[in-house]
């Protein structure tokens, strides 16, 4: 069956300085290709003029569609919902900040035409903060040491997914999906397209330290049991060490009954040490329990307040 329809998805939140420029770049690229297409923006309850700008553009272009969320459903759920609303033979995820070059759309489609079911852009260099780029590399290195599936380094989800891949993800029905891990778990070979990431075009980054932490813990809790195993092993080791220390103090007291004074300092240090370890381990367990709770609630990815140009 001939494949001739492409979906492009862009999640946005307060991107009034970027959405029109991004739209015009994508429009120019898609006009040069022999494909019908739809361009879906999903707005995460922006407080600036983002929705107004996209709405005006959509009045002139029926290929441009807009989903407006009832509230901000976060950086994980909103993009995934938009991917599921796409109807193309392939779906391309493109971020709104213009750091990822829209010009790569042609290469993604070329690789797809050659048979690839998943094509991802891979950052080989970046104009962003050097420290952040280095920390991201360390994160992927850590993930691949502890993960049951190998996460592809420096891939943010920017790329193309065949309709079959989108349908498989929809059937999984994960209420809080880690996209870059999900694509690897599906099992199809992934074609990588290297590129240099640009600086954000306009506005400030929407990625806070809390969002980065959420990404990290989502990846770990979904793809690794290593932290849980470490807790088990460490707990056994500490128990054994505590027994040895207790035997040492007992022997010292018996042998040097009159002169050996245990004192309160070792006990106080031990209490604080083991208390802090317990708090840390409870926090790790809490992350896994929170992840389970998110899934058993079976909440929808998002609730929409409005759609524009959808039939």
Language-model segments: residues:
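Short beta-strand/loop segment that forms part of the nucleotide-sugar
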Residues: 10, 23, 35-45, 67-68
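Conserved donor nucleotide-binding strand/loop of the catalytic core
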Residues: 37-40, 51-85
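Acceptor/aglycone-binding surface of glycosyltransferases and processive sugar-polymer synthases
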Residues: 67-85, 102-182, 198-217
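Hydrophobic helical membrane-anchoring modules
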Residues: 1-4, 178-311
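Acidic helix N-cap motif at the loop->helix transition within catalytic regions
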Residues: 17-21, 48-57
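A conserved acidic beta->alpha catalytic loop
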Residues: 43-51, 98-99
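N-proximal low-complexity "stem/linker" segments adjacent to membrane-targeting elements
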Residues: 1-28, 35
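Short aromatic/hydrophobic "clamp" motif used to bind/position activated sugar donors
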Residues: 91
């Amino acid at each position: 069956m001939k494949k001739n329809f492409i979906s492009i998805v862009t999640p946005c939140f307060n991107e009034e300085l970027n959405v029109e420029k991004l739209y015009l770049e994508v429009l120019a690229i898609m006009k040069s290709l022999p494909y019908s297409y739809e361009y879906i923006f999903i707005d995460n309850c922006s407080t600036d003029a983002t929705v107004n700008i996209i709405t005006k553009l959509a009045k002139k272009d029926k290929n441009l569609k807009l989903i407006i969320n009832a509230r901000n459903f976060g950086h994980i759920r909103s993009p995934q919902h938009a991917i599921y609303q796409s109807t193309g033979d392939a779906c391309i995820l493109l971020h709104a900040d213009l750091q990822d070059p829209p010009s790569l759309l042609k290469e993604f489609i070329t690789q797809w035409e050659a048979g690839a079911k998943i094509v991802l852009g891979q950052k080989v260099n970046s104009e962003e903060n050097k420290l952040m780029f280095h920390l991201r590399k360390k994160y992927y290195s850590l993930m691949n040491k502890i993960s049951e599936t190998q996460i592809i380094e420096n891939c943010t989800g920017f790329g193309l997914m065949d309709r079959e891949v989108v349908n498989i993800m929809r059937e999984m029905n994960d209420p809080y999906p880690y996209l870059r891990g999900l694509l690897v778990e599906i099992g199809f070979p992934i074609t990588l397209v290297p590129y240099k990431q640009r600086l954000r075009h306009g506005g400030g980054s929407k990625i806070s330290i809390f969002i980065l932490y959420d990404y990290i813990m989502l990846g770990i809790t979904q793809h690794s049991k290593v932290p849980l195993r470490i807790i088990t092993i460490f707990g056994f080791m500490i128990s054994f060490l505590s027994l040895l220390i207790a035997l040492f103090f007992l022997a010292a007291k018996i042998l040097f009954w009159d002169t050996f004074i245990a004192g309160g300092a070792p006990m106080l240090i031990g209490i604080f040490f083991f208390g802090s370890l317990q708090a840390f381990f409870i926090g790790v367990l809490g992350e896994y329990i929170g992840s389970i709770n998110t899934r058993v609630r079976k909440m929808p990815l998002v609730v929409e307040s409005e759609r524009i140009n959808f039939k």
